[in-house]
């Protein structure tokens, strides 16, 4: 996770909770999208930066893709958890908006479901641009802004998706989920797609690929079936615009 102030405080408080939640196989949405995410990133080589690595599961995926991975997160407890699991090749405690690396250090940067926890997204994206090499790629996953503002009207797989409040504006969200004996307290920022695109424009990053992935529900919990009708995530690839 990555951010400052309220975001670091939140993730520091629930670091152990998140580590248990994220590492339970097939427990949350990540597992239903993992194969598609691996294919979207693609096999590669060189230096990869996992921005807001959390407990390290995306770092481990990047290693599976063939990269040498540097994992960063502003929450020391999460960096420790990632390191204990051997998730990456190098680890640093750092926020997305203040990366301790030289210019043009990485071939790939990934921010997986991190930008919702960043208070200053434009500053974070400008930092990522700075540390990417000119030929580098930036992979972003966010909770789909549309999914963020609505909810399903019931628990059944075909329950209608309802949007009752405005899609626009920036809002703080907080909520608790309990599943299979595990509890997770989520918090972050909800904002429309335009906010992310404006931040990319200001960082002079151009989107080259966009996906609204569909979950693999073949062996996952039935609660994921509904997300085959409404996109839960939005994935982007961005490249540097020449200055």
List each model region and its residues.
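A short SAM/SAH-binding and catalytic strip from SAM-dependent methyltransferases
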Residues: 108-121
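Class I SAM-dependent methyltransferase SAM/SAH-binding core
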Residues: 49-51, 55-98
């Amino acid at each position: 996770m990555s951010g400052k102030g309220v975001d670091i405080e939140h993730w520091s408080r629930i670091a152990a909770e998140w580590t248990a939640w994220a590492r339970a196989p097939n427990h949350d949405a990540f597992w239903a999208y993992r194969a598609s995410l691996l294919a979207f990133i693609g096999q590669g080589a060189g230096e990869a930066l996992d921005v807001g690595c959390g407990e390290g599961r995306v770092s481990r995926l990047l290693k599976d893709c063939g990269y040498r991975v540097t994992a960063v997160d502003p929450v020391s407890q999460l960096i420790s958890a990632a390191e204990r699991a051997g998730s990456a090749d190098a680890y640093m405690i750092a926020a997305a908006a203040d990366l301790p690396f030289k210019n043009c250090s990485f071939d790939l940067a990934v921010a997986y479901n991190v930008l919702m926890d960043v208070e200053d997204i434009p500053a974070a994206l400008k930092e990522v641009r700075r540390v990417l090499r000119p030929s580098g790629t930036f992979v972003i996953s966010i909770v789909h802004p549309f999914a963020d503002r609505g909810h399903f009207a019931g628990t059944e797989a075909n329950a209608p998706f309802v949007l009752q409040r405005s899609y626009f504006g920036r809002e703080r969200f907080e909520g608790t989920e309990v599943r299979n004996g595990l509890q997770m307290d989520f918090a972050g920022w909800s904002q429309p797609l335009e906010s992310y695109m404006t931040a990319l424009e200001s960082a002079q990053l151009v989107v080259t690929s966009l996906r609204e992935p569909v979950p693999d529900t073949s062996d996952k919990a039935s609660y994921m079936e509904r997300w085959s009708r409404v996109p839960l995530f939005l994935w982007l690839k961005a490249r540097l615009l020449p200055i």
